[in-house]
Amino acid sequence: MHLYILRHANADTEAATDSARELSEKGREQARTVAKFCARHGIRPGVIFASPLIRAQQTAKPVAKELGMEITTARWLACGATPEEILAQLAALKDTAAVMLVGHQPDLGELIGHLLGAEGESVNVRKASLTHIEVLLPRKGGGRLEFAIPARLM
C-alpha cells in the first residue's frame, strides 16, 4: 500500500476551540499548492481520509477537488490517534493500493516514525507537507520512505 500522509496546512491560532481553528490565508494557499502537486505528479489515492477537525477538512478539500474525489471523514484521525490504531483502520483496506491521510501532529509524525522503525520516536512533520511511505508490512518498521516534501518546495 502506498500511504500519502498530509499534515494540515497553516491554521489561524485564534478560535473558540482547537477543533474550530480554520486555515489561514497562507494555509489555504498551501492546500491549493499540495492539490496541484498531487495532480501534476499523478498522485491519486483510492481514498482520502481526513480528521474531522476543520483545518484538516479544509486542507483535504482542494486535494479532493483537484483529483475529482470525495473526502471520507475519519474520527480515528482526530488528535490522539496512535500508530497502532491508524494501522488497524488501514488493515481493512488491504485491496486499496493507495491511501491519503490528512491529520495532525504529533500523531502523523509518530505513525511515520513507527512505520520507519524508529523506537518510540516521532518525526517532525511540517504543516502542509506530504510524506509518501510504501507500506510493505503494516507494522513497526514495515514501511519505506519514498519522499517527504513541504508545500513550499512543491
What residues fall within each predicted segment?
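Domain-level recognition of soluble alpha/beta enzyme cores
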Residues: 119-144, 150-154
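Active-site-proximal alpha-helix that buttresses catalytic centers in soluble enzyme cores
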Residues: 2-84, 108, 121-128
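Generic beta-sheet signal
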Residues: 3, 95-103
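Short amphipathic alpha-helix with an adjacent loop that forms part of the alpha/beta core around
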Residues: 85-93
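Glycine-rich phosphate-binding loop signature in dinucleotide/nucleotide-binding domains
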Residues: 41-43, 92-97
